[in-house]
Amino acid sequence: MVESKFTIGDRTFTSRLIMGTGGAANLAILEEALIASGTELTTVAIRRVDTDGGSGLLKLLSRLDIMPLPNTAGCRSAAEAVLTAQLAREALNTNWIKLEVIADERTLLPDGLELVRAAEQLVDAGFVVLPYTNDDPALAHRLEGTGCAAVMPLGSPIGTGLGINNPHNIEIIVAQARVPVVLDAGIGTTSDAALAMELGCDAVLLASAVTRAVDPPTMAAAMASAVTAGYLARRAGRIPKRFWAQASSPELMRTGEELGN
C-alpha cells in the first residue's frame, strides 16, 4: 500500500480528510460522523464556541484525540481576523489557525486583499496559517509567499455542494505550490472529494457534505474512502485520454483476425 501520510507545518497526519463541524444536528451525530471519517484534524469556529471550559465540542474533540483547528469564520477584515486568531491562541493554546476573511455574507467568498494582509500579520506573529482562498492561482501563490503553511482553495462557495467548478485552476495551484494544497468548500458528494485528490490536492476539508447529509456517519465513511481512492488513483497514474478506441488486448485481436482468415 502506498504511504498516505502528509505534513502541514510541524504536524504529520495519516488521514487526508479534514472535517468541519458546522451544520451538525447534535453532538451525538457529530461524534459518530467524526469517528467514521477517521479525521485527525477538525475545524472549530472560535467565535461560535464557548472556550471557557464549557464547550461540548471541544471536550468531544479532546476525547476523540482529534486536533482542533480554530478558524476565523465570519470575519470581514484583516484586523478582525487577526484579533480572533489571537483569542484562539490564548483560549486553545495553539498557534494553528484556519484563516477566513469573507467579502460578503451572501457568497461567503474570500476577500483576497484582506486575506493577504491578515496572513502577513499572523505569520509574523508566529502562527501556522492555513488560508481559505479563492480558486485563483495568483492569490494562492501570493499567500504561499507570505509564509502560509498550506493553501486552501475553494471548489465552489461554502455550503453549495456544487463540487469543483474550476478544476483547471486547482491543477495550476497544485502545480505551482510548494506547500500542501487542501481543497476547501463546495464538496457535495464522494465524486467531488475523489476528484480533488485526483487533481493533486494533498487533502480535502469538508463539513456540510457530511453534517447535512441524510445519514452523516455513513457519508463520513464514504468521504474517507473517496479521499483515499482519489489519492491512490493520482499516485497510480490514470491512462491518457484518447479520441479513438484502443483494444486492451491487441495481440489477442490480431490472433483472432488471423484465425478468421
Curated annotation (Swiss-Prot):
EC number: 2.8.1.10
EC top class, as a word: transferase
Residues annotated as catalytic: 98 (schiff-base intermediate with dxp)
Main location: cytoplasm
Protein's recorded name: Thiazole synthase
CDD domains, per database record: ThiG
UniProt subunit comment: Homotetramer. Forms heterodimers with either ThiH or ThiS.
Catalytic reaction(s) noted: [ThiS sulfur-carrier protein]-C-terminal-Gly-aminoethanethioate + 2-iminoacetate + 1-deoxy-D-xylulose 5-phosphate = [ThiS sulfur-carrier protein]-C-terminal Gly-Gly + 2-[(2R,5Z)-2-carboxy-4-methylthiazol-5(2H)-ylidene]ethyl phosphate + 2 H2O + H(+)
Amino-acid positions noted as binding 1-deoxy-D-xylulose 5-phosphate in the UniProt annotation, renumbered to this chain: 159, 185-186, 207-208
